[in-house]
Amino acid sequence: KLPWRVWKNTTISNKKYFELISNFMEEFNPEMLEIYNNLVQNKRIELSIDKYEGERYVRGLCFCVGNLKETYVLSRFNNKMNTGIILPHELGHAYLFYKSDFNNESNIFIEAYSIFIEFIFGDYLKNTVYAGSAFNNEYQRLDTFLGMVDYEFDNLIKLKGMNFDFPFYYTKDGSIGNVDTATLILSNMLGMYLTHLYRFDRDRYNNEIKVFLEMYGRTTDEEILKYFGLKNLTEGTEKTVRTYVKTYRR
């Protein structure tokens, strides 16, 4: 973790923040940039520090109106870069809705692409004056995930034989678990697997992200998990954690 004296929670104006997001999207994914520009032009992105009614601890939301094929994004951005990761995360949801033809059905991997975007946006920030915030945000993501896995270990070891039926998953022994656990764990793992490939094996990443976007919203969660495999997800997660440690030590 970055010492407090190194991490600087830099202030940024809305205008510069939108430019930063735009520059990142232009470099990372032109198709996503087009969606982002459309949301901005049609005033479907709202930045506000106000808490959402009924969602006190939520930092951002992305609404999908399937029959209209529209998305709306809310972000509790407070002009500090410690909240700068929220909008890219929610834009990841907007992009996933777009690629799945605005399929708004529950999916256990719904957070995977947005978590991946968090890491890649962080990598982009590491080459800017906002590097301290990038490392801190990445630490918070990894620390939250590892703490969750430790707390939910008993549930995690049952995932091998899971069968999904929202809002629960059913294991081979007949026990029932809340699907939120599986969603948070597996979405993080797939997001970090994609992150590792994007950083170190771009050809394989291009293939895997293409498959994921083709499967999402069109096949079952089990089929997606079977394709990527728990072994690959675990290895990708471990390597992403190690990469953070190695990069910071430099």
Question: Would you name each region that the model predicts?
Answer:
Residues I86-E90, A94, Y98, A112:
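Catalytic glutamate of the conserved HExxH
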Residues S133-T171:
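Amphipathic alpha-helical blocks and their helix-capping loop/short-beta junctions
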Residues M81-I86, N104-A112, G177-I185:
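Short, conserved micro-motifs enriched in small and acidic residues
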Residues K1-Y72:
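Contiguous, non-catalytic segments that form substrate-binding/exosite surfaces or channel walls
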Residues L68-L87, D101-E105:
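Short pre-active-site segment immediately N-terminal to the catalytic Zn-binding motif
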Residues S100, N104-V149, S187, F228:
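Post-HExxH zinc-binding segment in Zn-dependent metallohydrolases
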